[in-house]
């Protein structure tokens, strides 16, 4: 496996194999390249100097053979490095995406969506590129350094010491550059987050932007974050680009020193021309490798900044797990809230829900009503464990919801949220989200209950009509009815309608209510609504007021005895048949 700054990342065996093959090719290629100067020195000192043509041809063929083999191995190493890098990138993305699927709403609230997108794309690409392009110099440099240094000492120790003086200078320059550029890379990735957020928000709310004629404002807002990204990028790369000139300055200084000292040694008869040529070849190989290695360290510095952001996603502690789960499933659908308290963050001072207690029998229809901000949606979110209660217990069929495996629990509960979501694709494919094995008979039945059949014939291609991105090809009321049909297809024990008929006229809403009561009498139904007409026929109505249960009763009882219900009723009754 691969360890990514503390988080275990698994690489499939074939990618491990590619990485090993790449390193093997790189090492052998480096050895072959290092043999060429040795052969060349021998050719000059023994072949050319003595005028031995046969010897020159033999050594020339040896050099050509080394060059061809090095070329083949170089191509192989590039291929295997790319496969290893792409494989690692794919696995990191997969690991991140799978982790995100296990996030609770509370976990998701810790990140912005745009930031998560960046961590799945740009940050992974940085790591991927550092592996794909960095493996070659990273593998070559140690081999080159050890082998060439040994040969350099063998050729001439005096010149070798000149070369080794340059190494600490190169190291110090690289450390200074890395220390300055590393925090800037982190800021640059955060700036990319802001750009992605601006784009995402604009495209998601493009209709609102058009309706309010705020295009110029959005352009100005984007210009600001784009300029910030440009500024942060210029800072980071402005320091990073100093790497190459600094390395070249040291390299050329080293070469000049070697030529100067080598010339004196040749004049003194202590060094041959072929040996100096060979020595310079090794020095150039080593220094070029070290320059490439410095670029690898810069890439790694950027990839480490990205890796730390990815690790934040992978190391996020999932607060809703199956630790207490047993092998059980929901049988009936009765619900009990037992002194439940809830707040979104542990450090928050005030509770969103305070000491909530009530019972719902299996098959009952329960209405929940209250002013905006009274925590109605939060209340029902605790039933399928989208959030967990801070204190108290939520039970289904008398069993704590934490005892149910989450998959079984959520399979038994269907939620039609306030913000209805349809996916790109046909109407039929969206309905299959509720039950991928549903028959057409079951689909027709669900559509009849949800009154989808009333507009189905008017759709251009019926069930095959494309919904468009987010369901833009149907109206708000039609979208709500499709979402209700999708929930019915799930055949849940508990159906939660969270203000999901707000865009439907009262006559159609009444038909849906009657259809649910007649066709699905054993299903527990919880209806959150703003309109009293939506809940007046419920077996019990729960009134929430600032996160507390203000009253529970039937429409008649509450109308007679509860002030909050009376006020809501009075505010809605004018011109409406309640």
Give, region by region, the residue ranges found by the protein language model:
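Transmembrane helix-loop-helix hairpins at lipid-water interfaces of multipass membrane proteins
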Residues: 19-76, 80, 153-158, 269-273
